[in-house]
């Protein structure tokens, strides 16, 4: 994923999961290892910047469409959806089957169409307009609680929406980021989504949420792959529990 492309939440969200932003753990974390890791990832991959806010509802739908597909497919699917329905009110008036047919190329079309249709309907009923720009002004925990009420919207989708659209300092986790964080020892091997979000939202230094998220994705694709990771070339192997067992 490039720094300018929409984020992906490649895992299917669990609508019963807790909000993405929760109270921090009681014990203050040791920031030294994570600061080292962030610094060395930035030396290796650059310092990505999230320079501007974007429309939260657009972003939320993009994240829904990104689940279980590639960045390229999700962008293509979102573009097709916006071309077919220039406004979200037009999408709301459409049949769910028409939405599904429009996003078919992105996979899980029926499931995603149901989530999108339900989301739009509920926002319209509650707010009177299909507009989530008010999320820009809400405290992070309040924005997270609001988004968590929608069916099919879980912690990864919430965190990605708030980080990328609102520039909120919250840390999204997916399978790939979970893998790297477990390897370097920042989260336990057995760790729930809720606990992992607690740990990382408390641990990541202010101003580094976006950079760390994007660079972990880059690192996972370039070196820290699920199989045959290139530990000998890893810029953070010194602090990696897993890597130290292989070199």
Task: Report residues per predicted region.
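Catalytic cores of DNA base-excision repair glycosylases
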Residues: 21-247
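Short, contiguous pre-domain boundary segments
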Residues: 1-27
């Amino acid at each position: 994923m490039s720094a300018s492309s929409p984020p992906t939440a490649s895992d299917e969200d669990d609508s019963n999961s807790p909000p993405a932003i929760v109270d921090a753990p009681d014990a203050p974390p040791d920031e030294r290892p994570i600061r080292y890791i962030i610094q060395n990832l930035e030396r290796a991959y650059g310092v990505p910047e999230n320079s501007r806010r974007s429309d939260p509802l657009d972003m939320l739908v993009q994240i829904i469409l990104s689940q279980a597909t590639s960045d390229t497919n999700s962008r293509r699917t979102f573009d097709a959806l916006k071309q077919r329905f220039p406004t979200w009110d037009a999408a709301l008036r459409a049949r769910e089957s028409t939405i599904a047919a429009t996003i078919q190329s992105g996979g899980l079309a029926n499931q995603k169409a149901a989530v999108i249709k339900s989301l739009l309907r509920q926002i319209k009923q509650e707010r009177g307009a299909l507009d989530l720009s008010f999320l820009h002004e809400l405290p992070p925990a309040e924005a997270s609680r609001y988004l968590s009420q929608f069916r099919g919207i879980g912690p990864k989708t919430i965190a990605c929406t708030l980080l990328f659209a609102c520039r909120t300092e919250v840390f999204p986790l997916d399978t790939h980021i979970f893998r790297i964080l477990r390897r370097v020892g920042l989260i336990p091997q057995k760790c729930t989504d809720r606990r992992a979000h607690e740990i990382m939202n408390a641990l990541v230094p202010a101003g580094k949420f976006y950079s760390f998220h994007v660079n972990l994705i880059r690192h996972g694709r370039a070196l820290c792959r699920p199989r045959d990771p290139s530990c000998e070339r890893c810029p953070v192997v010194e602090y990696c529990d897993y890597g130290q067992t292989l070199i």
